[in-house]
Amino acid sequence: MSGPVPSRARVYTDVNTHRPREYWDYESHVVEWGNQDDYQLVRKLGRGKYSEVFEAINITNNEKVVVKILKPVKKKKIKREIKILENLRGGPNIITLADIVKDPVSRTPALVFEHVNNTDFKQLYQTLTDYDIRFYMYEILKALDYCHSMGIMHRDVKPHNVMIDHEHRKLRLIDWGLAEFYHPGQEYNVRVASRYFKGPELLVDYQMYDYSLDMWSLGCMLASMIFRKEPFFHGHDNYDQLVRIAKVLGTEDLYDYIDKYNIELDPRFNDILGRHSRKRWERFVHSENQHLVSPEALDFLDKLLRYDHQSRLTAREAMEHPYFYPIVKDQARMGSSNMPGGSTPVSSASMMSGISSVPTPSPLGPLAGSPVISATTTLGMPVPAAAGAQQ
């Protein structure tokens, strides 16, 4: 049997081909280290699989920062994260890397970031209005379209990696530790993203995926927000995850996808997939979530949650969907990417008939200051933990 049918991204296919090698060749990247003594840890914010995260103070200017101390992993992976963060610095809604220092105790690298008030999306988004959801989804799309245009897939889009300062309506896409450069025809590791947000391509072991993986993950976030069901696809393991998806999208389209790309399904699926019809999105609407659902929301969701990665909306196409007409209209009127606090109700009657332009947000200002940790006393002291890691 011949192997899987190759696939290439529909957009930004060759951006890395047209850039100098040093842009994407992260293994050759030379890291410029800042001064660890500029930083003093204040409290622990959380821990992840690959890092521990602290709130800290840059003692040269008294500004709050966030310090991500990386756990011992391959130098190659650390260099990849640093190179990607440097390439994306200043992009819309991308967390700003301010400095890189070495933890004086473990000698492992520590990344210093701009501080964002620490409400993670997961805690916040079950309280959001219809307008809020549209607003923040649009802000995430700005970050995704930007990183994709720069030849980079995030590969770990999920609520935990979206930081929102709701008071100032400021959003940042964080944790670029799994992000990777897109090269057409390259086969990638499918062990990326978090289970509930893994695209079908990962679950069926199709390695020639692209930026569209991030759009599936975004669709999972949207579904959980508008239906108030967290997570929306709740698999108990990676095999069950595909079953949960098939119970909503149906098995017929799944097999069409498998056939189109000549994918060989793991035999373990034989006993668990079964046969399922495609469900209408309306069946997930009930009295508790109907205020968040609209025809345009369901149409938008339907265009993201597609088995075939090539059929999903791109980030730029998504920004032009009628679901965002009220946001585009307001941002054009305000001439700004940050709306004032408000939770304007949205009705289909308020939809514009078309979009003339999508405003480009101004880049984030540079962070004053430099690297990561001052530690003779601080690192040795117990640090109180806070809910919700920032990085």
UniProtKB/Swiss-Prot annotation:
This is Casein kinase II subunit alpha. Tetramer composed of an alpha chain, an alpha' and two beta chains. Interacts with RNPS1. Residues 39-324 form the Protein kinase domain. GO terms for biological process: double-strand break repair; positive regulation of aggrephagy; regulation of cell cycle; rhythmic process; Wnt signaling pathway. Residues 335-346 have a biased composition (Polar residues). Belongs to the protein kinase superfamily. Ser/Thr protein kinase family. CK2 subfamily. It comes from Gallus gallus. It catalyses: L-seryl-[protein] + ATP = O-phospho-L-seryl-[protein] + ADP + H(+); L-threonyl-[protein] + ATP = O-phospho-L-threonyl-[protein] + ADP + H(+). Residues 36-41 are annotated as: Interaction with beta subunit.
